[in-house]
Design a protein with these regions (language model features):
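Positively charged n-region of N-terminal signal peptides that target proteins for export
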Residues: 1-4
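Cleavable N-terminal signal peptides
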Residues: 7-8, 18
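Hydrophobic alpha-helical transmembrane segments of integral membrane proteins
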Residues: 11-12
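Lumenal/extracellular ectodomains and adaptor appendage modules
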Residues: 18-169
Length: 169
C-alpha cells in the first residue's frame, strides 16, 4: 500500500510537459493597387513544439485568385512543391506549397525543426477590392481565428483613405 501511495504522490508532483506551438506574433502589410489587387506580406514569429507544418487557411477566395506565393524562413527562400499534408517533418523541411481542401486552400510551409523561426509569406490576391453598384468593398478575414500573442495589420494604397472612411472589424 505504501508503494501505491508513493507512486501516486510521485505522479501527482511530476512536471508535465505540454506540447503546443507558439505564434508569438504575426504582422501583415497589405498594399492595395489601383486595379483592386493586393500585394500582401506577412511575418510570422513562431516556435514549433509538434507537427510538421504551419498553414494559413484561405477558405473564401470567391472571385479572387492567389498568385506570386513565396515563403522565406529566417531570410532564406524555401522551395515550392506539390503539398502532401501526410509527409514528415523532414520531408517538408525547406518547402512550401498549397493544400486544396473542399473549403478552399491552405498556404502551407514546413516547420523544419522545433526551434524559434521567422517566416515571411508573400502573395498577391486579385479582386481584393471589388465593386458593387454604388461602392467599392474590401471584406477579408486577414488572419483566421487562432492563438496569436500579437497581431498587427497595416493597409496602404495608392489612394489616400479619408478620415471618414467606414471601417468595421
Amino acid at each position: 500500500m505504501k508503494k501505491k501511495i508513493l507512486l501516486f504522490l510521485m505522479m501527482l508532483f511530476m512536471p508535465i510537459s505540454v506540447l503546443a506551438d507558439t505564434i508569438y506574433s504575426v504582422s501583415m502589410n497589405v498594399n492595395i493597387l489601383e486595379d483592386g489587387t493586393a500585394n500582401i506580406v506577412e511575418k510570422w514569429d513562431v516556435k514549433a513544439d509538434s507537427g510538421s507544418e504551419w498553414y494559413k487557411t484561405m477558405y473564401e477566395l470567391n472571385n479572387s485568385e492567389l498568385t506570386n506565393y513565396k515563403v522565406l524562413m529566417d531570410g532564406s527562400e524555401l522551395k515550392y512543391k506539390e503539398w502532401d499534408v501526410d509527409e514528415s517533418l523532414n520531408e517538408k523541411r525547406g518547402y512550401y506549397g498549397i493544400n486544396d481542401t473542399y473549403k478552399g486552400i491552405e498556404l502551407c510551409f514546413g516547420k523544419g525543426d522545433f526551434k524559434r523561426h521567422t517566416f515571411t509569406i508573400s502573395y498577391t490576391l486579385s479582386n481584393y477590392v471589388f465593386n458593387t453598384e454604388d461602392s467599392q468593398v474590401l471584406a477579408w478575414v486577414l488572419f483566421p481565428e487562432t492563438n496569436v500573442d500579437y497581431f498587427s495589420a497595416e493597409i496602404s494604397s495608392y489612394y489616400k483613405f479619408p478620415d471618414t472612411l467606414d471601417v468595421w472589424g
